[in-house]
């Protein structure tokens, strides 16, 4: 049991994990998806109500067509394969990002998952796909301006984000040995505690999650106050 309401994870290191095992990048991404399946029961046991996974960034569109195509197929396969199990376990699916850039078939699969699980309340699994936080904030401001508002409040931006109901991030974990947040949930993670690990995401396990949460529990969050 933890007091974390929103855990965000940058699932980094899949390609480098594959390289260390003399495997193609695709196998690293597949191992990363398998790791989500492995750790979801632990997130449920910890009673963390909201999990966001950074799976495909807006910058990832600059990768090779082969890698992009595989990642699109992988999300489609994951949703088809895991949807019944996610639904059975009371998990609500949300997907945030510029989803209009995805194929019609993938958008349909995403919408089907969202619709099927919309009333579940044990855990919300938010998949950030074709996502960039600067783009999200830009899209929110564009939406507000289009509504005719001339004075923008903080609450207006919050309500125009991809998921207005998303709670602020408490803990942001990044495996992979990289020490940056890479345009991920900049608005929502304004006061998040950050935890970095040298381990690649496919090697991350239950004990690593527990260690990150234990480290978080020892910190004093001041939110700018003394």
Curated annotation (Swiss-Prot):
GO biological process, one term: polyprenol biosynthetic process
GO-annotated molecular function: ditrans,polycis-polyprenyl diphosphate synthase [(2E,6E)-farnesyl diphosphate specific] activity; magnesium ion binding
Xref: InterPro entries: UPP_synth-like (IPR001441), UPP_synth-like_CS (IPR018520), UPP_synth-like_sf (IPR036424)
Keyword terms of this UniProt record: Magnesium, Metal-binding, Transferase
Pfam families linked to this entry: Prenyltransf
Binding site for Mg(2+): 12, 193
CDD domains documented for this protein: Cis_IPPS
Record: active site: 12, 60
Group of enzyme by EC: transferase
HAMAP family referenced in this protein's UniProt entry, alphabetically: ISPT
Assembly: Homodimer.
Known EC number: 2.5.1.-
Keyword Ligase appears in the UniProt entry: no
Official protein name in the record: Isoprenyl transferase
Cofactor(s) needed for function: Mg(2+)
Function: Catalyzes the condensation of isopentenyl diphosphate (IPP) with allylic pyrophosphates generating different type of terpenoids.
Similarity remark: Belongs to the UPP synthase family.
Residues the entry annotates as binding substrate: 13-17, 25, 29, 57-59, 61, 63, 174, 180-182
Annotated organism of origin: Rickettsia bellii (strain RML369-C)
Keyword Lyase assigned: no
Manner of cofactor binding, per the entry note: Binds 2 magnesium ions per subunit.
């Amino acid at each position: 049991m933890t007091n974390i309401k929103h855990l965000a994870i940058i699932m980094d290191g899949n390609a480098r994990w594959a390289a260390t095992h003399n495997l193609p990048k695709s196998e690293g991404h597949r191992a990363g998806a398998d790791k989500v399946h492995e750790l979801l029961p632990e997130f449920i046991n910890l009673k963390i109500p909201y999990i966001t996974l950074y799976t495909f960034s807006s910058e990832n569109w600059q990768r090779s067509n082969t890698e992009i195509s595989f990642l699109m197929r992988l999300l489609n396969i994951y949703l088809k394969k895991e949807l019944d199990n996610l639904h059975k376990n009371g998990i609500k699916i949300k997907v945030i990002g510029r989803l209009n850039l995805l194929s019609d078939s993938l958008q349909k699969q995403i919408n089907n998952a969202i619709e099927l699980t919309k009333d579940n309340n044990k855990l919300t699994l938010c998949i950030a796909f074709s996502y960039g936080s600067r783009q999200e904030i830009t899209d929110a401001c564009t939406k507000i301006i289009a509504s005719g508002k001339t004075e923008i409040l903080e609450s207006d931006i919050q309500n125009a984000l991809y998921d207005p109901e998303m709670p602020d991030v408490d803990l942001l974990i990044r495996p992979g040995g990289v020490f940056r947040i890479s345009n991920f949930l900049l608005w929502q993670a304004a006061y998040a505690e950050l935890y970095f690990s040298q381990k690649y995401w496919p090697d991350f396990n239950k004990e690593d999650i527990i260690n990150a949460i234990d480290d978080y529990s020892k910190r004093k969050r001041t939110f700018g106050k003394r």
